[in-house]
Amino acid sequence: DAPAVRPMFAALVATSDLFKASVEDLDWLYPGRSYQDVAHEWLEQGAALVAVTLGGDGAWACTRRQQTTVAPCPVVVADTIGAGDAFTAGLLCALAEADLLGAGHRADLRAIDDPTLTRVLAFAARVAALTCTRPGADPPTRSETHQARRQSGVT
């Protein structure tokens, strides 16, 4: 029941620096609203960064200062199970590598520049894409993640 869940989301957003959702999640939770509109509302409620996975259309993220979209990574899809979790793990990994996580870095996350935001989002999308190349929720290996990091420009 989406109307019953919305207040819980509002409470979570108000206390979260980072919020990730899929476009499917948002279509269910806020029917008839664009993901961009919902994300900007979440920023107003307190989130520093909102990331939205767009399925086969890539991913999008925004802060109050900017927004960026990354194209999907071209892979042969075996299974999409675990892709969202892998995206979130990749996003957190890349943000940690950029020293943008934690209460002490909240202002830095809010001020993330466009090149960094794009690199972080591209890395998360690549990790999700790697997960889709094999059946089951089978995230990439450490070696594959390092290769993805190099390919997406995250150091």
Please provide the spans of the model-predicted regions.
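Conserved phosphate-binding/catalytic region of the ribokinase-like
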Residues: 31-155
